[in-house]
From Swiss-Prot:
Bias kind Basic and acidic residues: ranges: 77-89
Protein localization: Cell inner membrane
Chain's role: Could be involved in insertion of integral membrane proteins into the membrane.
Name of protein: Putative membrane protein insertion efficiency factor
Length: 89
């Protein structure tokens, strides 16, 4: 399944993306993020992470660097942990 999804992403990047132009507000681009997420996390979780990323990529988003979370991290708790550690004295 991973191979099929990555092949579809490669097709999009080579055939469709050049026609639309560069519109992604993030680094890496959404298609590169999706490929990395699928490679690191597998088809199911990688697709979920890619879908969340696509929902964040819109004209009102600030964009910036948004890397795929490491395979052993729980991305849902990461912002809360960072926020809690910044409030400690």
């Amino acid at each position: 399944m991973q191979t099929v999804l990555i092949a579809l992403l490669r097709f999009y990047k080579l055939a469709v993306s050049p026609l639309l132009g560069s519109r992604c507000r993030f680094y890496p681009s959404c298609s590169d993020y999706a490929r990395e997420a699928i490679q690191y996390h597998g088809a199911a979780r990688g697709t979920y992470l890619a879908a969340r990323r696509l929902c964040r990529c819109h004209p009102f988003s600030a964009g910036g660097v948004d890397l795929v979370p490491p395979p052993n991290s729980d991305a849902r708790n990461a912002p809360h942990e960072a926020e809690a550690s910044s409030h400690r004295l």
